[in-house]
Amino acid sequence: MKTGALATFLALCLPATVFATTLRLSNEVDLLVLDGKKVSSSLLRGAESIELENGPHQLVFRVEKTIRLPGNEERLYISPPLVISFDTQLISQVNFQLPRLENEREASHFNAAPRLALLDGDAMPIPVKLDILAITSTAKVVDYEIETERYNKSAKRASLPQFATMMADDSTLLSDVSELDTVPPQSQTLTEQRLKYWFRLADPQTRHHFLQWAEKQPPS
């Protein structure tokens, strides 16, 4: 898709539905999967928030933070992938509250027994279910979407089976042909639909920045 057409396509993707929950992102949280779908890191990079509908949600993420080592040295701590499920039915804002993670001892404790909180707009705790996402794949590059689907089918602590069935077949992401001016190959259509999905979730500022970037890209 040419860049100008891409920008126009995305501009038309603004949701007609009024979203009711704002998920405030943290620069210490690497969001990997949202509600069974792999996160588009390029689209959400630098975003301060994403908009969600009211109802149950599930995040897969890693905590990434620079910690201190002996001798005034530092290293980047990356937690194991975590799964957290929660409900935003009566909540308008969700904020991460991470525990203190400043050194190797605190990082080791977090690895063994991760704990964190989600707070609403009044800084009140939101009921959550938190678990570690055990990776079954031996591939060098982990497909967190597939791993999350397996997790959600296994009746674990933070499993939400409805998000496993949603991702069982990528064809469920494809909309009617009438939404597109032309019919591209199915793989390209799926790429567009995924991009459309994440564009709709991004906050207005992130949408604006992405459209500016898209306009500057050379035509394919």
Curated annotation (Swiss-Prot):
InterPro entries listed in its UniProt record: UPF0319 (IPR018635)
What domain of life?
Bacteria
Signal peptide: which range, if any? 1-20
Pfam families membership: DUF2057
Keyword set, alphabetical order: Signal
Report the family membership: Belongs to the UPF0319 family.
Which NCBIfam families does the entry mention? Answer: CrliSynInhib, PRK03641.1
Annotated protein name in UniProt? UPF0319 protein YccT
Q: Which organism is it from?
A: Salmonella heidelberg (strain SL476)
